[in-house]
Every structure is written in C-alpha cells, then in structure tokens.
Amino acid sequence: MNGPDTKIPQATAKRLPLYYRFIQSLYNSGKLRVSSAELSEAVKVDSATIRRDFSYFGALGKKGYGYNVQHLLTFFRKTLNQDEVTNVALIGVGHLGTAFANYNFLKNNSTRIVIAFDADEDKVGTTTQDVPIYHVSDMKEQIKANHVDVAILTVPSQFAQSVADELVEYGVTGILNFTPARLNVPAHVRVHHIDLSIELQSLVYFMKHYSQSAEGVKS
C-alpha cells in the first residue's frame, strides 16, 4: 500500500470518478457487494486494470468475495473529497458555456458552477439556470468573493491566454480549457485541455484504423 503522500498514476486518478459514479449507483440500488468483473462490464475498463488501480490504495476487497459496496463508496467519497464543495466559475456564456450552466454537474454534488462571466452586455446582469452572469471586468472581485478554485474556459481562442493569466492572478488553481489554445500557466496551476474537434478527429481515426471486434477502443 502506498503512503498517504504518494501520488498515484494520472491514468488511475482519471478513472476514480468513473468508479465512484458506478459504486454510488450500486449503493443507491441496495447492492451490497460487487466483483471486479461486474465493475469491468459497467465502466468498460478491464478487470486487471481495476484491480491494479485499487491496489494503490491497499486492500479494498477480498479474494473470492469482491468489494463491499458501502466500504468502496465511503473510500471514494473521502478520496475524491465528495463532502467538500468546489466552486466553479464559467468564463464565456456562448452555446457551449450555456450547456454547461444548464447541466451544472447535476450528478456531482461536490462541484457547482456558482458564477459566470461574459463580455456581451446583453447577457451581463442576467442569470442562466440561477447562475448569475457578470461582465469579465468583474472577475477579480467576484472570483474572490465566491471563493472560486476552478474555472471552465469557453471563450474565443484568441482571448484564452489573457483570460487564463487573469484567472491565475485571482487565485484560480484549476482550469478546464475548452478552447483550441494551449495555455501557459505556472506549475502550481492544473490545466485540462479538451479540444472537441481533436477528440472528434481522434475518434474517426480510431474507427478507421483500429479493430472494434474485441472489447472496443476506449480512451
């Protein structure tokens, strides 16, 4: 078992929320235990990978028994800080930004969009799904007032870096970047780049060049 300060592989870390969501659904349905094979079928991750992921955290299950659902749920809630709410700011309330506001992490009680920003004066002063929209010039004051740690960036790509610079200056330490721009940020700031056009091109490439006959290709 790794120590509490040991960092697990990033690929494993990215799968933890996936495991948590399924375990939560099992718990809500009244299921008491689950096998790695059942987990594998549900989340489309092979059993060996699941067992390896879980091994980083010690003995989460028992051979021949599987995993206790309530124990797993408690573990993942603690590991993923599900009892702590992370406030998120939405920067850019266009079509994509509005979709995020409408969704607002309905299946995740630990993150919520609390504030949005846009340069369009017609949107400023309004709300979208109860999320107030402020002008981008108000970011400094409102991000600090709302204790925002994470920002979702859906602005035009030519403005992405300058907006990111401001966010970092105002104390944001995590950015989910949906623009094509590759952001330069300090080492203490985490950025996840999600370029939908690249994801689509990648999907088409894998469809054409990799066999789907076994268990499919998953990212």
UniProtKB/Swiss-Prot annotation:
GO cellular component: cytoplasm
InterPro entries: CoA-bd (IPR003781), NAD(P)-bd_dom_sf (IPR036291), Rex_DNA-bd_C_dom (IPR009718), Tscrpt_rep_Rex (IPR022876), WH-like_DNA-bd_sf (IPR036388), WH_DNA-bd_sf (IPR036390)
Main location: cytoplasm
Biological process annotations from GO: negative regulation of DNA-templated transcription; response to redox state
Binding-site residues, NAD(+): 92-97
UniProt cross-references to SUPFAM superfamilies, sorted A to Z: NAD(P)-binding Rossmann-fold domains, Winged helix' DNA-binding domain
Feature: DNA-binding region: 18-57
Source organism, top-level taxon: Bacteria
Record-level Gene Ontology MF annotations: DNA binding; DNA-binding transcription factor activity
Keywords: Cytoplasm, DNA-binding, NAD, Repressor, Transcription, Transcription regulation
Entry's localization field: Cytoplasm
Keyword Transcription regulation: yes
Function in brief: Modulates transcription in response to changes in cellular NADH/NAD(+) redox state.
NCBIfam families (UniProt xref): PRK05472.1-3, PRK05472.1-5, PRK05472.2-3, PRK05472.2-4, PRK05472.2-5
Subunit-level organization: Homodimer.
Entry similarity comment: Belongs to the transcriptional regulatory Rex family.
PANTHER family, alphabetized: REDOX-SENSING TRANSCRIPTIONAL REPRESSOR REX (PTHR35786), REDOX-SENSING TRANSCRIPTIONAL REPRESSOR REX 1 (PTHR35786:SF1)
Name of the molecule in the record: Redox-sensing transcriptional repressor Rex
Organism annotation: Exiguobacterium sibiricum (strain DSM 17290 / CCUG 55495 / CIP 109462 / JCM 13490 / 255-15)
